[in-house]
């Protein structure tokens, strides 16, 4: 269900803006997207796991807020990230 630390480090190294970056919107959105994908797979198998479904909805909301922030701050970075992650926005 949760992503491993190794996978998280791979995502951070792929989406980081500068060398010591771990908290930029791009990194946060990419990590949340990976967690959302993982949780979606879990919920396909365990349809009645409503506690995890609530966590999924919270993650989706957090990602939506970060995407809105990034779009308002820098549209080109936003569009590049959407394209790279394959999100439908």
Curated annotation (Swiss-Prot):
Question: Which SMART domains does the entry link to?
Answer: Ribosomal_S15
HAMAP family assigned to the protein according to its UniProt record, in alphabetical order: Ribosomal_uS15_B
List the Gene Ontology MF annotations in alphabetical order: rRNA binding; structural constituent of ribosome
Alphabetic keyword roster: Ribonucleoprotein, Ribosomal protein, RNA-binding, rRNA-binding
Q: Which InterPro entries match?
A: Ribosomal_uS15, Ribosomal_uS15_bac-type, uS15_NS1_RNA-bd_sf
Assembly and partners are described as:
Part of the 30S ribosomal subunit. Forms a bridge to the 50S subunit in the 70S ribosome, contacting the 23S rRNA.
Gene Ontology biological process terms, A to Z: translation
Q: Which family does it belong to?
A: Belongs to the universal ribosomal protein uS15 family.
State the organism's lineage.
Bacteria, Bacillati, Bacillota, Bacilli, Bacillales
Gene encoding the protein: rpsO
What does the record give as the function of this protein? One of the primary rRNA binding proteins, it binds directly to 16S rRNA where it helps nucleate assembly of the platform of the 30S subunit by binding and bridging several RNA helices of the 16S rRNA. Forms an intersubunit bridge (bridge B4) with the 23S rRNA of the 50S subunit in the ribosome.
What the entry lists under SUPFAM superfamilies is as follows: S15/NS1 RNA-binding domain
Any GO CC annotation of this UniProt entry: cytosolic small ribosomal subunit
Report what the protein is called. Small ribosomal subunit protein uS15
Q: Which Pfam family is one of those matched by this entry?
A: Ribosomal_S15
